[in-house]
Regions:
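Helix-to-loop junction immediately C-terminal to a conserved catalytic motif
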Residues: 2
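Conserved ABC transporter NBD signature motif
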Residues: 10-18, 30
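Conserved ABC ATPase "signature" region
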Residues: 66-90
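Conserved ABC ATPase signature
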Residues: 95-99, 103
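Conserved catalytic motifs of ABC-family nucleotide-binding domains
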Residues: 116
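Catalytic Walker B motif of ABC-type/P-loop ATPase nucleotide-binding domains
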Residues: 120-123
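H-loop/switch region of ABC-family ATPase nucleotide-binding domains
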Residues: 156-157
Length: 218
C-alpha cells in the first residue's frame, strides 16, 4: 500500500492511482501524500526531536530548504504543536537517543501528523506504550483522521485496541483474510477461528495482528 514494493499478483490502487502503472516521478509524488508510521521509527540517534518531526515535510520541500532545516529548524511552533498533542512538547530539543521506545513511537506519529498526508499507514504504532498511553494515542490518531478526512490503516496485535478504536476490522492469518467486518460484528467465534491453535485469553499487546482500517471518506 505504501508503493514501496510491487504486488506479486493483482493490483494495488491508492488515492485513485495504481502506483506501478505510474512513472517514477509520479509515484514519488503519490508517496508524498502517504505517511508511514513505523513500529520502530528510523530516527537517527543524535537527531533532535524537533528535526525528526519537521522531517515529515521533506518530501514537500526542495533540497535547499531541507538542508537549511537540518541546520536551523524552520517551523519550531509547528513541531511543538504536534508534540504537545502527544504529551512530548518538553522533548522538543532532546536528542532521539535519550527517548524511550514509546516516546520514539510518539515522535514518529508526530512526524506523520506534521506531514499532513491524505493516507496514514501505521505498523504496530503503539506496541512500546503502556495500555493507557496506547489507548490515548490511538484515540488521537482516529480523531485526527475523522477531522481531516484522512484514511488511516493500522496493523495491530492488540485486539481489544482494534475493536475499541476502529469501525472496520480485517482479521488476517498466514497472508489470508479470515474476515472483514465492522467492529460490532466481530464475535468470539470469529476470533477463535482466527487464532485457532493459539492461546487467546485476555487480549494483550503481544497477540497476533489484526488489521484495522479507518476510512472516514467511505
Amino acid at each position: 500500500m505504501a508503493s514501496a514494493l510491487p504486488p506479486s499478483a493483482g493490483q494495488v490502487e491508492i488515492l485513485g492511482s495504481s502506483p506501478w502503472q505510474l512513472s517514477g516521478r509520479q509515484r514519488q509524488q503519490l508517496r508524498r501524500r502517504i505517511a508511514l508510521i513505523h513500529q520502530a521509527p528510523p530516527l537517527p540517534p543524535r537527531q533532535r526531536v524537533v528535526t525528526a518531526v519537521l522531517a515529515g515535510k521533506l518530501g514537500q520541500w526542495g533540497l535547499g530548504k531541507s538542508l537549511l532545516n537540518l541546520l536551523h529548524p524552520l517551523d519550531v511552533p509547528g513541531a511543538r504543536d504536534v508534540l504537545s498533542r502527544l504529551d512530548l512538547a518538553d522533548k522538543l530539543f532532546v536528542p532521539c537517543q535519550q527517548l524511550s521506545g514509546g516516546q520514539l513511537q510518539r515522535v514518529g506519529i508526530a512526524r506523520a501528523l506534521y506531514q499532513a498526508p491524505e493516507v496514514m499507514l501505521a505498523d504496530e504504532p503503539v506496541s512500546a506504550m503502556d495500555p493507557r498511553l496506547a489507548d490515548h494515542t490511538l484515540a488521537l490518531l482516529c480523531q485526527h483522521a475523522i477531522e481531516n478526512g484522512v484514511t488511516l490503516v493500522a496493523s495491530l496485535h492488540a485486539v481489544e485496541l482494534a475493536l475499541a478504536h476502529f469501525p472496520r476490522i480485517i482479521g488476517v492469518r498466514d497472508g489470508q483474510i479470515h474476515f472483514d467486518l465492522s467492529a460490532s460484528e466481530v464475535s468470539r467465534e470469529h476470533l477463535d477461528t482466527l487464532y485457532a491453535n493459539e492461546q487467546l485469553s485476555t487480549p494483550t499487546t503481544t497477540e497476533t495482528p489484526a488489521t484495522a482500517p479507518w476510512t472516514p471518506r467511505c
